[in-house]
Amino acid sequence: MAGRYAPSPSGDLHFGNLRTALLAWVFARHDGRDFLMRVEDIDEQRSTMESAERQLSDLSMLGLDWDGDVLYQSSRHDAYRAAIAQLDTYECYCSRRDIQEASRAPHAKPGMYPGTCRELTPGQRAERRAGLAAQNRHPAIRLRAEVDSFTVVDRLRGEVTGDVDDFILLRGGQEPGWAYNLAVVVDDAFQGVDQVVRGDDLLDSVARQAYLCTLLGAAIPEYVHVPLVLNARGQRLAKRDGAVTLREMLVDAPLTHIISSLAASLGYEGISTPVELLAVFDPGALSLEPFIFTGLNGSATDRMDK
């Protein structure tokens, strides 16, 4: 049994990222699971090894330990290719504009691929493939889904039913890249991850990922979608909101104060280490409302419901 944290190395981790990492760690340790670390660096244009090293250093500094070696998605291309070979897929030649225009059609579901390329003839595929090649572009690869919805059980939210469409497994364009939905499912199965704690902004993708688990013969993990950290304007916290990364906060506050603020955002006062939080952590007491971050000197209990 294992939980995991899987940051994308595109910059330093901010207060919201650190809070989710702490929750992933404390859920896993509370339940007696191993805690694994994975670097989701398949987006080569945004990912850097420097960012990965800084993130891992920050998490270690915070007091989060993990079991085994760090897994880098950039080393997993063969596994993703093997997974696609097991699935019923087809090439998609649509541009983003094509999909946006199709979504405006009557009865179209927002955010759902309408299946434009699903039933093309071999001749139509050859013609469209040649058209993309002339632009030095590659088609995307989509899953040929046999369901339009899927239900999972989230530990905090109960049954969650989400839409499933013919979602992308391999992005097209001039530089093809593996899609998050494919990589995360393949890697969770490979690592034996049976608990996924992450931000609730990813709740919309859980049905697709759980359905993909069934197609690949992988067990569906326990999902725990935790609330995000928002800024004072009610928007998702971002690095542009000021001194919110660990290294920035350490300029003005000791590490114990930062950990105390993280724990207080979860409803626990007087905590100065993750181990202290683990000793008193109650998964059932976790608020489902977003936390409003107003700085380390702001109220540690500001939530949308107060």
Swiss-Prot record:
Annotated ATP binding sites: K239
Binding site for Zn(2+): C92, C94, Y113, C117
Enzyme class name: ligase
InterPro entries assigned to the protein according to its UniProt record, in alphabetical order: Glu-Q_tRNA(Asp)_Synthase (IPR022380), Glu/Gln-tRNA-synth (IPR000924), Glu/Gln-tRNA-synth_Ib_cat-dom (IPR020058), GluQ/Sye (IPR049940), Rossmann-like_a/b/a_fold (IPR014729)
Gene Ontology cellular-component annotations: cytosol
Pfam families on file: tRNA-synt_1c (PF00749)
Cofactor: Zn(2+)
Sequence motif 'KMSKS' region, location on chain: 236-240
Residue numbers binding L-glutamate: R4, Y5, A6, P7, S8, E40, Y180, R198
GO annotation (BP), single: tRNA modification
Its EC number(s): 6.1.1.-
Cofactor comment text: Binds 1 zinc ion per subunit.
Location of the motif 'HIGH' region: 7-17
Disulfide pairings: none
Keywords: Aminoacyl-tRNA synthetase, ATP-binding, Ligase, Metal-binding, Nucleotide-binding, Zinc
Superkingdom of this protein's organism: Bacteria
GO MF term (any one): glutamate-tRNA ligase activity
Function: Catalyzes the tRNA-independent activation of glutamate in presence of ATP and the subsequent transfer of glutamate onto a tRNA(Asp). Glutamate is transferred on the 2-amino-5-(4,5-dihydroxy-2-cyclopenten-1-yl) moiety of the queuosine in the wobble position of the QUC anticodon.
Family: Belongs to the class-I aminoacyl-tRNA synthetase family. GluQ subfamily.
Name of the protein: Glutamyl-Q tRNA(Asp) synthetase
Organism taxonomic ancestry: Bacteria, Bacillati, Actinomycetota, Actinomycetes, Mycobacteriales
